[in-house]
Structures are given as C-alpha cells and as structure tokens.
C-alpha cells in the first residue's frame, strides 16, 4: 500500500485574463477578480519567496482555443530561473511546440484530451515527458473549453485513458472548490490517485495549512497548486513551503525546527 507523500511541491498559480493576473470563483469568468496588474512582477515575487515552480493559465486562450497571452508568458519564462508550466488554449502540436520553444517546461492540455485523443497521443509521442493533462471536473464529471462545457465523462475514466496515451502527469482541479478556500475534495482526489500511475497535482479549494497537511496525507500526491489562498493572505508561500515542502518542519531536528517558531 502506498505511503503518504514525504512532501508536496507547492506551486503558485497565475491566471492571465486580458493581460492581468486574476482569480476566478468556481471557474466563472464574470467573477474575475484582479490580483495583480503586472503578472510578470507577481511571478518574480513568487520565485523570490521560494516557489519551486510556477503554474500559469491563459484564461483568454482557454475560452478562444488559441493562446492569447504569449508575450506575457514569454516574459515570465525569460525572467524566472524556476520552471514554468502553462495551460489554456493549447489545442495543437504547433502551439505546444511554440510554448516549449519559449522555455516553458510543461505544457498542460485539457480539452484536447477529451475531444481529440488521437491528437493527445501525437503530442505525447512528439514531446515525451512534456505534456501534462489538466483534468477539471464538476462533481466528478470532466469539464472542457475553459470550464464552460461539462461532459458525461468521469474524471477517473479520463485518468486511465490519458496515462495509456503517454501523458506525463495530471493536474486535477475540482471546479466546485476553485476559489472558495473551502478545502480540497479529498474523496475525489483519493479516487483519482487510486487509478493513476502518473504524478498527480491537486488544485481547487485549498485554503489553509490544515488543507495542505490533509493533502500531504494522500498516498502518491505529488503537489498542490495555490491561487486564492496566496492572494487573499490565507496562506503565505514561505509557511506553506515550511509545512509541506521539502525540508518541512517535521523533517528538521528539534533544535533546528525551533528556529521557525
């Protein structure tokens, strides 16, 4: 039986909409709230605070089907020394290559995985290890096209399908929890982890260190993406890293750990 994760990769999110960094509530574009006027500057702040990686979503691209915020993404990648993963509107091999050529480490596809499995397989074969699948679900059912369309496909079924097609990993977002700070959907995550042989990163609803510690207890979970929790001040990135990241509090000898008190 798998053991609880030794640590989680804590990944700040930057969601791009019309050139700004925003947060949505349950995926609702009408409820977009600006969290930073300058996304590049915000990315640099997260990197300075110790982020091991950055998660960037092109919300305009997710709706339109074509990456819209490429100049901003290119600027973020150029100025950061940490790896950047990008999703939103990547529905062709050409677009995936374009992002990787900019220096993006991982490309995250969602709609393609549901609507064009053959294209997903072509992408994973052409770009091995670089294509991750974003599985976004409402009550366990997969949503696509920037969360604007819900399908009858079960998230667990899609996990099994994409790992057979060569995906490198999965980012699972519970749309009903997204932006709520109400806590992650642990039961759904357990179901995802039970069928996945791939690394899984959780997103949606994380609002406290207690939530992060609950995620840490899930066997096989690789990481957690934080958005609103960081921007609202509910969690600070340094304390999240100390709580569940590599070298977390529990891994320190008592005399060293006391320095963080």
Curated annotation (Swiss-Prot):
- Write down the superkingdom of origin: Bacteria
| Active-site residues, Swiss-Prot/TrEMBL | 15, 136
Known catalysed reaction(s)? Answer: 1-(5-phospho-beta-D-ribosyl)-5-[(5-phospho-beta-D-ribosylamino)methylideneamino]imidazole-4-carboxamide = 5-[(5-phospho-1-deoxy-D-ribulos-1-ylimino)methylamino]-1-(5-phospho-beta-D-ribosyl)imidazole-4-carboxamide
Q: Broadest EC class?
A: isomerase
- Gene Ontology annotations of biological process type: L-histidine biosynthetic process; L-tryptophan biosynthetic process
NCBIfam families per UniProt: 1-(5-phosphoribosyl)-5-[(5-phosphoribosylamino)methylideneamino]imidazole-4-carboxamide isomerase
Which named protein is this?
1-(5-phosphoribosyl)-5-[(5-phosphoribosylamino)methylideneamino] imidazole-4-carboxamide isomerase
| Annotated organism of origin | Synechococcus sp. (strain JA-3-3Ab) (Cyanobacteria bacterium Yellowstone A-Prime)
């Amino acid at each position: 039986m798998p053991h609880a994760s030794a640590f989680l990769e804590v990944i700040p999110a930057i969601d791009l909409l019309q050139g700004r960094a925003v947060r949505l509530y349950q995926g609702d574009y009408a409820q977009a709230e600006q969290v930073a006027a300058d996304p590049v500057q915000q990315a640099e702040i997260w990197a300075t605070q110790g982020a091991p990686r950055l998660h960037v979503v092109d919300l305009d691209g997710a709706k339109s089907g074509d990456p819209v915020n490429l100049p901003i993404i290119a600027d973020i990648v150029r100025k950061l020394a940490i790896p950047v993963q990008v999703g939103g509107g990547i529905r062709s091999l050409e677009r995936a290559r374009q992002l990787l050529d900019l220096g993006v480490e991982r490309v995250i596809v969602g709609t393609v995985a549901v609507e064009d499995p053959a294209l997903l397989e072509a992408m994973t074969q052409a770009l091995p290890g670089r294509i991750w699948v974003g599985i976004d679900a409402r009550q366990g059912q997969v949503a696509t096209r920037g969360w604007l369309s819900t399908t009858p496909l079960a998230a667990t079924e899609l996990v099994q399908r994409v790992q057979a097609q060569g995906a490198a990993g999965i980012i699972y977002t519970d749309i009903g929890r997204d932006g709520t700070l109400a806590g992650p959907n642990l039961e759904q995550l357990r179901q995802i982890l039970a069928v996945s042989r791939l690394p899984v990163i959780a997103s949606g609803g994380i609002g406290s260190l207690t939530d992060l510690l609950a995620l840490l207890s899930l066997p096989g979970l690789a990481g957690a993406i934080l958005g609103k929790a960081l921007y609202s001040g509910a969690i600070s990135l340094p304390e999240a890293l100390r709580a569940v990241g590599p070298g977390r509090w529990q891994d320190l000898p008592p005399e060293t750990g006391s320095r963080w008190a």
